[in-house]
């Protein structure tokens, strides 16, 4: 008798995705981050439900409702900090997942890659709106500054900002709609994840060598179902260590002060995972130019398949490209640091140089060095 997992309409889908899925035999721990992102999304949705039961999206009570969750709700503090620090874990896994895609040339699967970029934008939008909800000082001023960037759009900018705000400033209407969007976006993210996986399973996974591995495939279960839980264990251990020992390590002290439109914080900045893009935005003196650079800092990923000039897919056997890749990583860390610094000398010039290096590396140096490596293959 044929196994039910191979015949039942629903079980068949799960079987082809998680059990009998042909996977390359040589994929490393860098391929774990997809499932870790799934785990992060699950943690975020579950903790979000518990928080949404007690949170009120009103400017008068939002801050005190978050305080109430931490003080009066049974284990509310751990749920709140699991959600806040879970977002940080989510972005760490996202950045490593994207970095792995760049290093090993996974962007050549253009449909999967482009859906991934949409996912990145959706998760960033979700995280930004979530940061506004506690209605602390940084929530309010972060929302004001970031939404105000849309006013740089010619002709419709000012009307667009007021339409998003629901008035002439960030107020109750803004908070209510941000809560609604923050609630619905993770489900859109989950739907996009399904499309992402659908396109991935059309082509099969890439592997560290970048060479087609159809001749050497192994079933996902048991070989990789036994490897994935190790990543889960490490991620949850790291998250719980952060939550139980230093829950406010990655937050901003200003967000423990209730929002006050009459008092501007000395230094407005977003969460740490947006600082690299924020530094690029600030490095350009022109408002519209800054906004375009901000969008391009993420949208540049869509150009990766077009900028791939190498005859080899992966960077595994390309030492010059490897060097440039790690310079890019160092540059992004530098931008993250600069984004958290005040706008003064020497941080302004460092930010401008780091922003220039970021775009110059991706648009110019990496494609040229790939062509040089092609020539070296003939030696």
UniProtKB/Swiss-Prot annotation:
Cofactor binding notes: Binds 2 heme b groups non-covalently.
Record's keyword terms, sorted: Electron transport, Heme, Iron, Membrane, Metal-binding, Mitochondrion, Mitochondrion inner membrane, Respiratory chain, Transmembrane, Transmembrane helix, Transport, Ubiquinone
Highest taxon above the source species: Eukaryota
Gene Ontology biological process terms from the UniProt entry: mitochondrial electron transport, ubiquinol to cytochrome c
Cellular component annotations (GO), alphabetically ordered: mitochondrial inner membrane; respiratory chain complex III
The protein's required cofactors: heme b
A Pfam family annotated for this UniProt entry: Cytochrom_B_C
GO molecular function annotations of the record: metal ion binding; ubiquinol-cytochrome-c reductase activity
Subcellular locations according to the entry: Mitochondrion inner membrane
Binding positions for heme b b562 per the UniProt entry: 83, 182
Residue ranges crossing the lipid bilayer per the database entry: 33-53, 77-98, 113-133, 178-198, 226-246, 288-308, 320-340, 347-367
Membrane topology (UniProt): Multi-pass membrane protein
InterPro entries recorded: Cyt_b/b6_C (IPR005798), Cyt_b/b6_C_sf (IPR036150), Cyt_b/b6_N (IPR005797), Cytb/b6-like_sf (IPR027387), Cytochrome_b (IPR030689), Cytochrome_b_C_euk/bac (IPR048260), Cytochrome_b_N_euk/bac (IPR048259), Di-haem_cyt_TM (IPR016174)
Coiled-coil features, chain-numbered ranges: none
Main localization of the protein described in the UniProt heading: mitochondrion
Subunit structure of this chain's protein: The cytochrome bc1 complex contains 11 subunits: 3 respiratory subunits (MT-CYB, CYC1 and UQCRFS1), 2 core proteins (UQCRC1 and UQCRC2) and 6 low-molecular weight proteins (UQCRH/QCR6, UQCRB/QCR7, UQCRQ/QCR8, UQCR10/QCR9, UQCR11/QCR10 and a cleavage product of UQCRFS1). This cytochrome bc1 complex then forms a dimer.
Function: Component of the ubiquinol-cytochrome c reductase complex (complex III or cytochrome b-c1 complex) that is part of the mitochondrial respiratory chain. The b-c1 complex mediates electron transfer from ubiquinol to cytochrome c. Contributes to the generation of a proton gradient across the mitochondrial membrane that is then used for ATP synthesis.
Official protein name in the record: Cytochrome b
Organism: Ochotona rufescens (Afghan pika)
